[in-house]
A protein has these predicted regions:
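Short boundary motifs at domain starts and secondary-structure transition points
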Residues: 1-5
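Conserved acidic segment of CheY-like receiver
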Residues: 8-19, 24-28
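Short hydrophobic/Thr-rich beta-strand motif most characteristic of the beta2 strand and flanking loop
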Residues: 34-40
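Acidic, metal-coordinating helix/loop segments flanking the phosphotransfer/catalytic sites
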Residues: 40-56
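Active-site residues of response regulator receiver
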Residues: 58-62
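Short, conserved loop/helix-junction motifs that constitute active-site signature segments
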Residues: 68-73
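Output/docking surface of receiver
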Residues: 79-125
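C-terminal single-pass membrane-anchor helix
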Residues: 121-153
Length: 153
């Protein structure tokens, strides 16, 4: 299967609850960094993984407990209510790489996905972005000093 050299990472989301799945899919799509496909059942996810190779599978522990073992062909991040549930679910996927709490803030969920995809714990600003922030700080400081000078004179 052809994949362009420059593409967005593919995330396969496996969550059976429609509202929860839609919410997580929306969070990931709002980042505009990922291609996201969602499956409600494990069998559907396995079929999707064959035709659409994902870079990461984000899998609800409840789906694994109900549907059994899965060969998704991608590193799996488990959505679980706690460490015990995550440990049990990790035995059901072929390449478990950790877990994230179901009640985690969206920033933590995105950070966990990003960490597995890039190996980096945080996304860092580049030197141009830092330069821009420095220029803005200097301009704002200059404006503040100007306003103080006008108020005094």
């Amino acid at each position: 299967m052809y994949r362009p050299a420059i593409s967005r990472p593919r995330v396969l989301l496996v969550v059976s609850h429609p509202s929860v799945g839609a919410a997580i899919e929306t969070i990931l799509r709002l980042e505009r960094r990922y291609e996201v496909r969602r499956a409600a059942k494990l069998a559907e996810a396995v079929n999707l993984a064959r035709s659409w190779p994902a870079d990461l599978a984000l899998v609800d522990a409840l789906v694994l407990r109900r549907d059994g073992r899965a060969e998704l062909g991608a590193p799996a991040l488990i959505l679980a209510g706690g460490a015990a549930e995550a440990a049990a679910a990790e035995r059901s996927v072929d390449n478990p790489q950790g877990w994230v709490a179901k009640d985690a803030p969206s920033a933590d969920l995105v950070a966990a996905v990003e960490h597995l995809l890039t190996g980096s714990l945080t996304t860092e600003a580049g030197s141009l972005a830092l330069f821009g922030i420095g220029v803005l700080v200097l301009v704002l400081a200059g404006l503040l000093l100007y306003l103080i000078w006008i108020a005094v004179v």
